[in-house]
Amino acid sequence: MEARDKQVLRSLRLELGAEVLVEGLVLQYLYQEGILTENHIQEIKAQTTGLRKTMLLLDILPSRGPKAFDTFLDSLQEFPWVREKLEKAREEVTAELPTGDWMAGIPSHILSSSPSDQQINQLAQRLGPEWEPVVLSLGLSQTDIYRCKANHPHNVHSQVVEAFVRWRQRFGKQATFLSLHKGLQAVEADPSLLQHMLE
């Protein structure tokens, strides 16, 4: 779930709790769409009050993947006024958030860690032609880029993966998410690229 959507759920937590959202079809819909597991449903239903049930649902949702917030909105068919409130809050948060602000919500130990192979692979899938200026801003040379291209002449994805793996090997502990964020900012690449890697 995106940082902005987590913020919306946090800011409306008490209001949502007061609506006792778990009594209708909400849980069933979230289960059907694969957002909640059977264990989640049992855990929520075991709570003694409607407020506690809703609060537990709100605690679980942020960790249930990128589609959780939109699926939650879809589940609120019986509560159109709640859905409207959430959509409005989301628009306001989006308007307020400068692109780099979601970084503030990421723990420092993650920012100072290096991306895994899987995360580099994810980034390579999303990065377009701007990958070359990004790796140059991270400290690789034109020669490095040339080698990556020579090693994988017909596969841009593999060129990008190799370039970031070289960056990680060469810079060791300095090859962090934070330096990657700065590299993306330096070439004005889409900052949400990093967000997707960390979800």
Curated annotation (Swiss-Prot):
Q: Which organism is it from?
A: Mus musculus
Domain (Death) ranges: 116-188
Per the record, its GO cellular-component terms are:
cytoplasm; endopeptidase complex; nucleolus; nucleus
Q: What is known of its domains?
A: The Death domain mediates the interaction with PIDD1 and the formation of a complex composed of 5 PIDD1 and 7 CRADD proteins which in turn probably recruit 7 CASP2 to form the PIDDosome. The Death domain mediates a direct interaction with the Death domain of RIPK1.
Keywords per UniProt: Apoptosis, Cytoplasm, Nucleus
Carries keyword Protein biosynthesis?
no
Under which name does UniProt file this protein? Death domain-containing protein CRADD
Job description of the protein = Adapter protein that associates with PIDD1 and the caspase CASP2 to form the PIDDosome, a complex that activates CASP2 and triggers apoptosis. Also recruits CASP2 to the TNFR-1 signaling complex through its interaction with RIPK1 and TRADD and may play a role in the tumor necrosis factor-mediated signaling pathway.
Assign the protein's first listed, main location to one coarse class: cytoplasm
For this protein, the record's Pfam families field holds: CARD, Death
